[in-house]
A protein has these predicted regions:
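Structured catalytic-domain cores with a bias toward divalent-metal coordination
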Residues: 1-372
């Protein structure tokens, strides 16, 4: 294992931060998988899974079973990890800018088209390398003006040339679920099956440029743009993995999830040895555009009738909100049928606050599809 410490530019006198990446196998070998944990710094289950992954990858490297290079960033957000305010860790948003750490990465497609068009040809593998080189060139030219953007540039650069990118997160209260690009469904199904995911949410563009799409979306967009002229592969499979709820920090679960990720990487050819049998998938892929985010109709005490993982039928109440001043109770009614895969942990809510998400099978939403 090779450890690399990446210094972030100092934006305040007398302070410095760094990011640690762990490199297993052979770098610059032509094969690369990249895994990062806790980009939202308060999503601790991902960090524990990374600890278990590190031990497993060290053992596999000692056995000579790493095919190519696997890069692990066991804690992807030193900025957010330091944002402890009066006993609460604010790891989702940069307190300086108010921007989500998993939004506003560089969407490179438009800038790539004029760069690569004169260079592309009939060789798909050569085209992949041309596009990766040009992408790195564009990222190198990014001049961040905030500390958070410096971190985003570093993370996107580390992942940009990878064949597989896995971004490990968690929700507040949730079952394990997975996000991926619609063109990547076939590659995502084995990952979801090994992990035991209960929802797989797919979209070609979820909005606001999250990390996982910043490294994969260019491939299907360039393939569409140059269709009939140049062959372009979906050369990067990326996915966001939500490792249940935020308090599910447990060694048994973390070891289970780490093994599932090892099984997936073996299945994908990035780790040698026998391939674990593929479990039966617990869910089908459903459109992110079909997710219903239920909002509180009034402020008050939130009482759920349904738990994460429960099936919900359109027209069914999943909970109620009780106004403590008027005693008025208002039901939360689902308008779609599907799986309730996530809900908030707060039990006093404000009007129009998002409180739960249901994975429906029929697309009906447009625009920015992710939570803030």
């Amino acid at each position: 294992m090779r450890t690399v410490l990446h210094a972030l530019p100092a934006f305040s006198a007398g302070s410095s931060r760094q990011l640690r990446s762990l490199h297993f196998g052979l770098g610059h070998s032509g094969r690369k998988a990249y895994i990062q944990a806790s980009l939202h710094a308060d999503e601790v289950p991902a960090m524990l899974v990374a600890q278990h992954l590190k031990k497993r990858l060290e053992a596999l490297e000692a056995e000579g079973l790493i095919e190519g290079e696997i890069v692990l960033v066991p804690m992807a957000n030193p900025i957010g990890l330091a944002q402890d305010q009066q006993g609460s860790l604010f790891g989702r948003f940069d307190l300086t800018t108010g921007i989500n750490f998993n939004r506003q990465y560089r969407h490179l497609t438009a800038a790539l088209i004029p760069l690569v068009e004169p260079l592309l040809g009939a060789d798909e593998a050569a085209n992949t390398q041309i596009i990766r080189t040009a992408s790195m060139r564009l990222l190198d030219g990014w001049q961040p003006t905030t500390e958070a953007d410096s971190l985003k540039k570093l993370l996107q650069t580390l992942a940009m040339d990878a064949d597989i990118v896995l971004d490990l997160h968690c929700d507040t209260q949730a079952v394990l679920h997975v996000y991926a690009g619609t063109p990547l469904v076939a590659q995502t199904m084995p990952l979801a099956a090994y992990l035991g995911a209960q929802a797989l949410l797919v979209s070609k563009a979820s909005g606001d440029d999250p990390f996982d799409e910043s490294v994969s979306r260019i491939w299907w967009e360039l393939a569409e743009h140059f269709a009939g002229r140049f062959p372009i592969a979906n050369a990067c499979f990326s996915s966001t993995v939500e490792l249940r709820g935020e308090i599910e920090v447990d060694h048994a679960l973390a070891a289970q999830d780490a093994q599932a990720l090892i099984n997936y990487l073996t299945h994908a050819g990035h780790i040698g040895g026998p391939v674990a049998p593929l479990p039966e998938a617990l869910c089908a892929a459903t459109p992110l555009e079909g997710v219903e985010p239920l909002t509180a109709p009034q402020a008050g005490i939130l009482v759920f009738f349904k738990a994460p993982g429960d099936a919900v039928t359109a027209g069914e109440a999943i909970g109620e909100v009780i106004d403590p001043l008027t005693d008025q109770a208002t039901l939360l009614i689902a308008s779609v049928s599907g799986t309730l895969f996530a809900r908030v942990s707060r039990r006093y809510v404000t009007r129009q606050m998002r409180v739960a998400k249901i994975a429906g099978s029929v697309a009906f939403r447009t625009g920015n599809l992710l939570s803030m």
